[in-house]
Structure formats: C-alpha cells, structure tokens
Amino acid sequence: MRNQFICVALLLCALNSACGLYFHISETERKCFIEEVPDETTVIVNYKVELYDPRSNGFMPSSPGIGMHVEVRDSDDKVILSRVYSSQGRISFTSHTPGEHVICMYSNSTAWFSGAQLRVHLDIQVGEHAIDYANVAQKEKLTELQLRIRQLLDQVDQITKEQNYQRYREERFRHTSESTNSRVLWWSLAQTVVLVCMGFWQMRHLKSFFEAKKLV
C-alpha cells in the first residue's frame, strides 16, 4: 500500500506541466515552442514583453504599441489560434487532438530602431495546473474540503488523459514500427529478386559467349 502511494505521488509530480522562462527576439524573429498535450486539455500561456533600452543597458516595460502575434497549431498542423495580443497577457486554448502543439510568437512591430531587442517572459501551464482554483472556489462558493476534492478529481482526470495519451503514442509508435518493418521486408525481397534475375542473366550471357566461341 505504501509503495502504491509513493508511485501515485511520483506520478502527480510528473504531471506538473508548467514551465517558466524568458527569451530574446529581434524585430522579425519568430520563436516556437512544442508542448505535448493530451486531448481535451486546457493550456494557458502567460507572457510579458520588455523592450531593450540602450541608455540604461537593460530591459524596460514595452510601449503600448508593441504587441505579440501568437499562433498555435495542433498535432495535425491545423491553426487553432492566431491573433495579435498586447505586450502582456494571458492566452487560453483547449486541445481537441492529442499530440505536439506548436506555440509560435513574434512581434507585431517593424518600426524599431536598429539593434533593438525584446525580452519575452513566458509561462506555459497545462491541465489542472492551468486552473485558478482560488477563482473557482470564490465563484462556486466551495469550502476548503470541497475545493480539495475538486483538485483531486481534476488530478485523477489529468492522470487518465495522460495515460490515454501514452497509449496513443505507443499505438502510433507500434504502427510506425510495423510499417517500417514491412517496408524493409519488401525492399529485401525486391533486392533478392533483382540479384537472382541479374545472376540468371549473367549465366545466360556467359553461356551464349562460350557457345559463340565454341568452348562448350
């Protein structure tokens, strides 16, 4: 029983699908991030843009005219979100197909002076980590116990989605492996047939040559 509890705890820790980082982009540069997301899972992206100030040699809050164009594509390369946001915001979308989702960001401004840079702070949260439970408790008037039960139910639901996604990946990998093995087999058979045909042709050619020279 204790070992089962430890396994569940480790699995819950592994599901902590949130990452915070920052990156620099230039005027026309495009940055993309890949996030593996199960189906019917909420993803929230928080970002903040800072503009490089050469006078202070640091990054300052960007002007209101500078924003970010955000584009999200699902595992089928279908655009599920594409629009221009302000210099700081919160983006939310729900996946409808499991797999790799590509989140791309680039500036909507092309009027910067030469050498300007943007620093973009980015935080991506997936699954139950994207839910604001304080807001949920206030909106639905939940007690502390009810809220905790709600969190546990969401975690179980996320674990189920993750398991289904892993099964989906295993099935896709197995299908790819079987397809590759089948192609290798047919290619080997084709090579064998070609070699046999070439050997047969060479034997007939040599026989004709020897007969022409009256050696046989």
Curated annotation (Swiss-Prot):
Q: Name one GO cellular component term.
A: endoplasmic reticulum membrane
Topological domain, Lumenal: which ranges?
Answer: 21-183
Q: Where in or outside the cell?
A: Endoplasmic reticulum membrane
Q: What is its main location?
A: endoplasmic reticulum
**Motif range for Prevents secretion from ER?**
213-216
Coiled coil, from the record: 134-164
Q: Where is the GOLD domain?
A: 30-126
* Transmembrane annotation, as ranges: 184-203
**Signal peptide (from-to):** 1-20
State the Gene Ontology BP annotations: dorsal/ventral pattern formation
What is the superkingdom listed in this entry's lineage? Eukaryota
Give UniProt keywords alphabetically.
Coiled coil, Developmental protein, Endoplasmic reticulum, Membrane, Signal, Transmembrane, Transmembrane helix
The way it spans or sits in the membrane comes to:
Single-pass type I membrane protein
Which InterPro entries did the record assign? Emp24-like, GOLD_dom
Please indicate if the UniProt record lists Nucleotide-binding as a keyword: no
The record's family statement is: Belongs to the EMP24/GP25L family.
Instruction: Please give the function described in this protein's UniProt entry.
Output: Eca and bai are essential, though not redundant, for dorsoventral patterning of the embryo. Specifically required during early embryogenesis for the activity of maternal tkv, while the zygotic tkv is not affected. Involved in Golgi organization.
Record protein name field: Transmembrane emp24 domain-containing protein eca
Q: Which organism is it from?
A: Drosophila willistoni (Fruit fly)
